[in-house]
Amino acid sequence: MSKDLLLEIGTEEIPAHYMPSALKQLHEGAADIFAKNHLDYKDIRTVGTPRRLALLVTGLAEKQADVSSKNKGPSVKIAFDADGNPTQAAMGFARGQHIDVSELVTEDGYVYVDVTVAGSETKALLPEIMKKLVSSLAFPKSMTWGNEDMRFVRPLRWFVALFGTEVVPFEMAHVVSGRTTRGHRFLGTGDFDIQAPGEYVDLLREHYIIVDPEERRDMIVNGLHAVAKKQGGHVVMDEELLEEVVYLVEYPTPLYGCFDTDYLELPEAAVITPMKDHQRYFPLRDSEDRLMNMFLTVRNGDDYHLDTVRHGNERVLRARLDDAKFFFAEDRKKSLADRTEDLKRIVFQDGLGTLFDKSQRLAAIMTFLTAKLDLPVEEGEIKHLADLAKTDLLTQMVQEFTELQGVMGREYALLDGEEPETAEAVFEQYLPRFAGDELPHTTLGLLLSLADKFDTITGSFSLGLIPTGSQDPFALRRQTIGVLNILIDAGWNINCDEVFAYILEVLGTDRNKREDVIASLHDYFVLRLKNILQDAGFDYHIIDCVLQGDSMNAAEIVKRATALRDSEFSTQEELLQAYTRVANMVKDAQNTDVDDTLFETEEEKALYAACLAAEAELPQAYAVYDYRCAVEILGRAVSAINNFLDNVLVMHEKEAVKNNRMNLLTRTLGLISPVGDIKKLS
C-alpha cells in the first residue's frame, strides 16, 4: 500500500539564483533519506516559486520494507564443545540476540543468527524526515529572524505536509505544519487548504500560482515570442536571464515597452546592459537583426492595468539610458591612449601594485610568451596593447556598469581609430568569463588573455592568497581553467611552470620563496587539468598516466591523453597491457645498455629490432608533439613485447644474460615514457 506525499516550505522571497540548487537539493535529499529508511516510492518531483519550495512524492510506501541480516557470532570451535554441545560462548551470544541457542546457524566456520527487523509505519517516521529535509537545505547565505536560532535562506512562514489526506505533524522555528497554503500576494484570495497532494499543482494554479518552473518557463517563452511578433520583432532570448525571471515570478505575464530612438545611437552594449542586467528586460531586434527601441519584460501578475505597468518600466529604463548617454559622452572626451597615466591612481591589488604596474607586467609576459611560442608579433604591438588593456576601467561607463569591462574597451578603441585586432584583444582578455563561454580567437587576444590571467594567478599565489574550499575571492579557479582551456584550444605548447617562474622574477618575489610558490601553482594547475580531462570523458587510468611528470604543458598533455584514448588499441588491451607488463618487470631499473651478443633467443632479437626501429622514428614524432603518430609507432612493438615476455625467462641463471634482458626491457619501457607514466595503468 502507498500514498502520495507533499511537503511545501513557505518562505519570504528566495533569491532567484538560489532556487535551482535548492530544488535539486530537495529532490536528492528526499531520494537519499527514503533509501536510508528503506521506503519505496514511484516518483519524486520538486517544484517551487520565490515563496515556496515543494516536494511531491507519488506512491510512497506506507510501511518500511523489512530488513533481514545475519549477525556473526563466535567460531564453531568456540561455540560448541567436542560433543557438539553449545558452550557458554554460544549461549551468551544467543542470549544477546534474544533467541534460543537452538536457532543458531553455522556457516563458514562461524555461528550466525538470522535477524529480520520489521519495518515501521511511514507516518511515524515522516515528522523527523520532514524536519531533516528542511534543515538539510544549504544556501550561499542564510539568516536568522525574530528570536529564532534556526538559520534559513529567508524567514519560514508556513509548512504544508500531507501524507495522503493526513497532515504530517512537525514544528520548526515555531512554524507548525498543516494543510493551509497561500496564493499570490496580490491576485490570490487569501489562505486556502490542500486536501491531498494530487490536487496541489492545479489548486495553486486556480489561486494564480504557477508552481511548476517548467510551466512558468513555457508561459514566459511563448508569451515573449507572441508579444515580440505582434510588435514586428523577435526577442533576444538570454538563457541566464530567462532562468532568473522564471524564479522571480509566480504568475508571469509578458508585456512590451518603448524608449526613444535617440538611445540607439549609443553602442549596443550600452543599451542592452542596463536593459538586461539591471532591469531584467529582454531586447528586441527587427528582421535585419537591428536593435529596436523596444523591450520585453515579465510582470508578476495578470494583464490588469498593463499600460500603467508599461509606463513605469519605461520610466525606469529611460533614467538608466540617460545615465548611459551621459557616461558615453563624457568618456568620448578622452581617448583610451590618453588615460594610460591615470592607471597609476588605481590599485590593482594590495601587494601587486597599480593597474599601471599590471599593464607593464602584461607587456613583459606577452613578450615572454611570444618568444617561447615563436609568434610573429611585433614588440611595439605588444607594448601598445598592454598600455590600452586596462584603460576602459577608468571610464564612467565601465565604472557604472562593471560587466562592460572589455566590451566598452573594444568600442572605445575602435572609435579612437585603433586597429581592429587591437580593439578585439582588449575585449578578449576577459574571455572566457564563465563555463562554456567563448575563447579568444585572435593572436593578440590569446596573448593578452593568458598574460592577464597568469599575472593575477601567480601574483595571488605569491602573496599566499590560495583558494581553499569554497573561498575564492579573486576567481582564481575560473581563471586557471580559462588559461588551460585557452592553451588546449590554441594548441600552444608551453610549460606553465616556466611562465610562473618568469612572473615571479618580474614581481621580484623573494628567491627563497619562488620554488614553493611554483610547486603550489603546479599542483593547482594539475588538479584543474585533471578535472577538465574528467569532464571530457577520459578514463582515469589515462589521466593518471599523462599527468605524471615535471612539465605542466596543458596542450601537450591533452594530446597525449587523446592519442592513448583514440588509438586503434583499446585502453585496457594490447598496447597499454603490453607496456604495463614491461613496467611491472622493470620496476625501478635504470640501465638501458644492451649487448646483442648475449642474445640466446629469437624473441630477444625481435624485441631489440623493434626497439631500434621505434627509437629511429619516435624522436621526430615527440619533437612536434604528434602523439597519435607516436602511439602508432609504439604499437608496432607490441607483438615483439608479448612474444618476449611469454617465451623468455628474464631471470636467467647467468647474471650477464639476466641483466642484459632486464636492460632490454628498461630500454623498451623508455620508448613510451614521454607519453606518460605507464605504471599508472597497472
Describe the residue ranges of each PLM region.
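Amphipathic alpha-helical "coupling" segments that flank catalytic cores
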Residues: 1-682
